[in-house]
Structure formats: structure tokens, C-alpha cells
Amino acid sequence: MESRLSRWCDGLLEAGWLVAILAIPIFFNIHSERVFEPDKLALLRSIALVMVAAWLVGLIDRRGWRDVARLRPSDPAAVWHRPLVLPVVALVLVYALATLFSIAPRVSWAGSYQRLQGTYTTLSYIVIFAMMAATIRTPQQVRRVVSTAIVASIPVALYGLLQHFGHDPLPWGGNVQDRVAGNMGNAIFIAAYLIMVVPLTLARIVDAVGAILGDDRLSAADVARAAAYLFILAIQLLTIYWSGSRGPLIGLAVGLFSFTLVLLVSLRGAGGERRGRDTLFGLALLLPAVLALLLSPVVSATVGPAVAFSFFMGVVVLSVVAIFILVTLRRGWRWLWLAWIALTVFMAGWLL
């Protein structure tokens, strides 16, 4: 039986990573010289130190040294058998050796004055990751992590929109209207952050729409939830687009493709025995994309490439929407993953 102190330490650990997920993307300090990265990382390092202290107190209270046998590789429950443990240990060793043999060990450890991205910062990342991997055990905790990440993205995205429309109250030295920088101080950084949150928001949208279509009686709470997540997704995508960063846009495209493919493949085994009907659903999604691909040269020669591109992308968007509708309606699950791959290939073929 755990003591009250151990439960308090577990609560402090969870509060630590939730605060990190919420505060680091939003926080910046206009009263310091460097404003963004060093100030964010100073806060992150402090959170990591508090989490380490809470973990050590909990370890002592539980007498965790009695479980030292779990460090043996021969033990089936050993920590070494968990995913990513060995790669993370290898990464820590590489950073330690690189810092030890660096021509400027102090800079390698603490990071540069402008960025503060040194071994100390990397170890802070790893500490928070390790604490989360070791202590997140319930679906409720996972939901809290996802919800916190989505909530943190809202002020970041909204601030980007303010900058784009010229309503930023802060006088930045660079042009943040053509390429928004938001709370990150860099157009690439804000887009790179938001593309990590977009799949989480999209998953909540799928869940909310599924609840709406799956219930016999329409729930106002489900409708409000779906509308809220759709709004959040819209401002996230707009901020990513107005950042003008090509790399994150490519990463977003690859991430959305992978997210959807994993989702559809995971549903393949739950499609039931309606193979003929599921095959028809999959083919029905491919036909519009094939026709759009074949008709695009004709449309391009008639009204121009811009209209042809809009025509093809419109058909692709409608096909993607149809896929998600079929997912929520529990139709065609067996072959939707193949339709998604083929649709992506057709789109890539048109672009190339």
C-alpha cells in the first residue's frame, strides 16, 4: 500500500509534465534580452529538476532499491525490455562523451548564450520523457496529456493569427505579418510545434464525430465538442500555413498520411464479414480520384493549370472527407486503408 507521500510525489510528477506541456509553448519573456528559447529552457530545466526531486523522494519512500533485480537483462520485467529504453540510454552516453571530449565542455554542457541547447537541456528533455514513460499507466492520464497539448496550442495559434492580421501589440524587430512567429519567435518553430498537435486534434474530431453519428439521439455536448475541435484545427492549420515554412508543411503532410494510414489499418480487422460491400466502398472512393487525375490535363488545357489544380484538389478533399465519414459510420473498414494509399499515390502523381 502506497503512503500519502508517495501519492503526493506521483501527483507532483504528473503536474510537472502537464505544466511543461502547457507552459513551455506559451511562455516568453519580453523583459529579457533573448525573449524566447533561453527563457523557455530555463523554465523547462527547473520543471525537470523538481520532477527529479519528487521521483527521488518517492523512490526512497517506497524503498525502490529493493527492485534492483529488475535491472538484470535476464529478468522478463526488466526495464531494458521496454521500447526506446536502450536508444535513449545510447543517446545519453553519446551526449556525455561528446561533452566530455568537447573543445569547450562548458558550452557543450550549458549551451550557447543565444540558444541554450546544450547537454543539460537535452537531459531535461530526456528526464521528462522518462518520467512520463514510467508513470503514465491509465487512459485518464493519456487523455489529460492530449487535452493539455491541444489547449496549449490554442493561444499559440491565436497569437499567430493576430500577427498575420497586423494586430500584434508587441513591436518586434522583424516582419511577423508575412511569416508569423507567435510565441516561438521563429516561423519554423511555431509551425513545427503545431504540426505535432494537429494529429491529436484530428483524433479528437474523429472521436467526437463518431459519437454524433453513432448515438441514436443527438447530444448537444458532442456537437459542441466537435465544433470546438474543428475550430482549434482550423486555427492550427491557418497558423501553419501563414508561417510560410515549407519543411513543417511537408512534415504535416507526411504526418497526416501516416496518422490516417495507421488509423485505417487498425480498423481493418474490425470490418466484419461484409467483404463485397467493403470492396465496393473502397472502389467508390478511388473512382473520383482516378477520374480527376485523367480529366486534369483536359481541364488544364481548357481553363488553365490553376483551375485544374483546384479541381483535382477539390476531388481529393471530398474523397478524404468521405473516408472519415465512412470511418465514423463503420462502413468499408476492410479496404479503406488501400483506398487511402491509392488516393495519396494519385495525388503525388498529379503533383509530380
Spans of model-derived segments:
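Alpha-helical transmembrane segments of multi-pass inner-membrane proteins
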Residues: M1-I30, R45-L59, R82, P87-P105, ...
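Membrane-interface anchor segments at the N-terminal boundary of transmembrane helices
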Residues: R34-A48
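Membrane-helix boundary/helix-loop-helix interface segments in multi-pass membrane proteins
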Residues: A69-H81, V85, F101-Y113
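Flexible loop linkers connecting adjacent transmembrane helices
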Residues: D61-W80, L213, R217
